[in-house]
UniProtKB/Swiss-Prot annotation:
Gene: inh
Top-level taxon in the UniProt lineage: Viruses
MF-aspect GO terms: peptidase inhibitor activity
GO cellular component terms, A-Z: virion component
Organism encoding this protein: Enterobacteria phage T4 (Bacteriophage T4)
Descriptive protein name: Protein inh
Length: 226
């Protein structure tokens, strides 16, 4: 359940203070707080006990919120949802209401354009080959970019619990995911570089299993990312 290889690397560090600091950061990924005044080995024991406690908690009966739920809620808030499908109420709570702008636009009248303006219209011959090429280029440009994980990537998030399990994700990382529907295409655009490995790990599990169940730390709610 605990990443023993990573723990061994930390224990091998010459600077014990740095090792315990990194160990505390590792624990925070699961929403676990540790006391840094304890010895390294005792902190490891505390983390293992906390992970066992998390693993024994019952799994949620629902799949939580998906990215589609969040997108539908955002579309509904902006008046862009045109189907009759009901918006998930939990997703709607996560989406802020649009900000009303008080900007005033001043309309300035200009001289009217004469109605009898002579406009030269030239007939351009239709070239089917060029048209099809232009359409193909547009379709290609609109394809979503695909992010490729680093070669031999190994996730730093460990799944806990029964079946496929779940992983704990800091709330501020989940908030960015919820606000960025295409986050899987450009995870490195998140301004906090310390979160990139976590995002890579989530993409790893989604690519492998089709989805990943996370537990965000603010409300301890479960959410399914696809």
């Amino acid at each position: 359940m605990i990443d023993k290889d990573y723990i061994a690397e930390l224990k091998a560090l010459d600077d014990n203070k740095e090792a315990k600091a990194k160990l505390a950061e590792y624990a925070e990924q699961f929403g676990i707080k540790v006391k840094k005044n304890k010895s390294f080995d005792n902190i490891v024991v505390d983390i293992e006990e906390a992970l066992q406690k998390l693993a024994s908690e019952p799994m949620p009966e629902t799949d939580g919120l998906s990215i589609k739920d969040l997108i539908d809620a955002a579309d509904a808030a902006e008046g862009l949802k045109y189907d009759d499908e009901e918006v998930n109420p939990e997703a709607a709570l996560l989406i802020d209401s649009p900000i009303k702008s008080d900007i005033k636009i001043e309309v300035v009248e200009t001289d009217k354009i004469p109605e009898n303006t002579d406009v030269l219209i030239e007939d351009t011959p239709f070239v089917e080959e060029k048209f099809e090429q232009a359409v193909a280029e547009i379709i290609e440009s609109e394809k979503p970019s695909v992010f490729t994980l680093p070669e031999n990537f190994s996730p730093n998030l460990q799944l806990i619990g029964k079946n496929l399990g779940f992983c704990t994700v800091p709330w501020w990382i989940y908030q960015w995911i919820a606000e960025t529907p295409d986050w899987k295409s450009h995870p490195t655009s998140f301004e906090h570089a310390s979160a990139h490995q976590t995002l890579f790990s989530l993409i790893y599990y989604i690519n492998r299993d089709g989805s990943v169940l996370i537990r965000e730390t603010r409300n301890s709610s479960f959410v399914t990312l696809k």
